[in-house]
């Protein structure tokens, strides 16, 4: 089973796959780089102004606290903290933040739904993230009347070393890979970019092997290319691997 996440985010998937008796192939198609931009510095400088801070990834939390270690102590006690899911909540908690909102649906849409019970009109909202993310969340917040600062906290791009991803493509085309997991639309798009002139052939192969997507947004990107994928009810790596294992006739405890 191939894992296309960045290496530093792959340990859980590898452990689950190997624990189920499979062999994990780490072939990152995405690289995350911290970006200590002026907009992120502004999030730190204005820490005591925020009514709501939203984190949609572990990388955003880690980048902000790398730049501004005292952030948790600088925000107001009545400032709410919202995160995309339980893993981001755990990382935020490790940095001293009290997490107030975790949506049931671990997507931007889920976060917006979780905020609908609040009147956030006029609120100052900090949203540190990658600028390559979808615009659904900031636009939705603005439609609710919030003043949103989207701060670039990290950059998502092709890995500097595409060798492992190229080996994955070779393995898929040679029939040596049984399944591939994707955890974001970018992991899908970047694999196709790395494939280059083998893109069409790769897409046809992915239509035949087992593919897992962590959630509906990633699934949608795959479906744009006619690729079907297993998607878990809860959008976590553990649930994705479990759903894939069941689909392949395995069992993950």
Curated annotation (Swiss-Prot):
A Pfam cross-reference name: HEM4
Pathway recorded for this protein:
Porphyrin-containing compound metabolism; protoporphyrin-IX biosynthesis; coproporphyrinogen-III from 5-aminolevulinate: step 3/4
Gene3D superfamilies referenced in this protein's UniProt entry, alphabetically: 3.40.50.10090
Q: Example GO biological process term?
A: protoporphyrinogen IX biosynthetic process
Q: Which UniProt keywords apply?
A: Lyase, Porphyrin biosynthesis
Q: Which InterPro entries match?
A: 4pyrrol_syn_uPrphyn_synt_sf (IPR036108), 4pyrrol_synth_uPrphyn_synth (IPR003754), UROS/Hem4 (IPR039793)
One Gene Ontology term of the molecular function aspect? uroporphyrinogen-III synthase activity
- Alphabetical list of SUPFAM superfamilies matching this protein: HemD-like
Q: What is its EC number?
A: 4.2.1.75
Catalytic activity, per the record? hydroxymethylbilane = uroporphyrinogen III + H2O
Q: Which family does it belong to?
A: Belongs to the uroporphyrinogen-III synthase family.
Q: What does this protein do?
A: Catalyzes cyclization of the linear tetrapyrrole, hydroxymethylbilane, to the macrocyclic uroporphyrinogen III.
Record-linked PANTHER family: BLR5956 PROTEIN (PTHR40082:SF1)
Q: Which named protein is this?
A: Putative uroporphyrinogen-III synthase
Species assigned in the record: Methanothermobacter thermautotrophicus (strain ATCC 29096 / DSM 1053 / JCM 10044 / NBRC 100330 / Delta H)
């Amino acid at each position: 089973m191939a894992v296309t996440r960045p290496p530093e985010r792959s340990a859980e998937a590898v452990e689950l796959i190997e624990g189920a008796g499979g062999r994990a192939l780490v072939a990152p198609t995405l690289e995350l780089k911290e970006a200590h931009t002026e907009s992120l510095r502004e999030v730190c400088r204005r820490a005591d102004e925020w009514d709501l801070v939203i984190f949609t990834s572990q990388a955003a939390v880690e980048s902000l606290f790398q730049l501004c270690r005292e952030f948790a102590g600088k925000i107001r006690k009545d400032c709410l903290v919202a995160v995309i899911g339980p893993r981001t909540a755990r990382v935020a908690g490790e940095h001293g933040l009290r997490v107030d909102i975790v949506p049931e649906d671990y997507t931007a849409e889920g976060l917006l739904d979780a905020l609908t019970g609040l009147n956030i009109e006029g609120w100052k909202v900090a949203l540190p993230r990658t600028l390559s993310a979808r615009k659904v969340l900031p636009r939705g917040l603005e439609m609710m009347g919030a003043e949103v600062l989207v701060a670039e906290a990290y950059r998502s791009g092709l890995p500097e070393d595409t060798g492992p991803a190229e080996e994955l493509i070779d393995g898929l085309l040679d029939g040596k890979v049984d399944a591939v997991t994707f955890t974001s639309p970018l992991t899908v798009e970047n694999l196709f970019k790395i494939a280059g002139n083998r893109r069409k052939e790769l897409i046809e192969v992915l239509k035949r092997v087992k593919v897992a997507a962590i959630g509906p947004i990633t699934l949608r990107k795959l479906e744009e290319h006619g690729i079907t994928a297993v998607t878990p009810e809860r959008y976590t790596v553990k649930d994705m691997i479990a759903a894939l294992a069941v689909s392949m006739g395995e069992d993950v405890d």
